[in-house]
Amino acid sequence: TSTIQFDIPLRKPHMRVATNWRVRPWIFKKITDASPAYISLLRIGNIAFIGTPCDFSGELTAAIDERANALDLDVLVTSFNGGYIGYITKDEWYNLKEYETFVMNWYGPYNGAYFVGLIQRLLEVIT
């Protein structure tokens, strides 16, 4: 059994109100509650439970599953663990004007690949 928890470095938050209009980071912080941003991992045998501080898109798990299988691990990624930093979706959807990708994606583009990379690296660390 092993456990890991670490803070995730993130960009400054913003909220998009139109395609080229964003609420400044200092205003975002004034109108929202601060939330911890960390990833946690619990490994029991060959099962790894990964906790994320976001609404983590299921579309991102294929690459994580592939890495876990190569390491002979089964993995379960969960959302809303310990904090909330908005939606983390596939990077290609960042500019899509939908609720999850436009309104609730608070930390800019490329977080899908960023989170997948962090989780894949965590899986390597625990094997």
Task: List the predicted regions and their residue ranges.
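Non-catalytic substrate/cofactor recognition surfaces at enzyme active-site rims
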Residues: 1-127
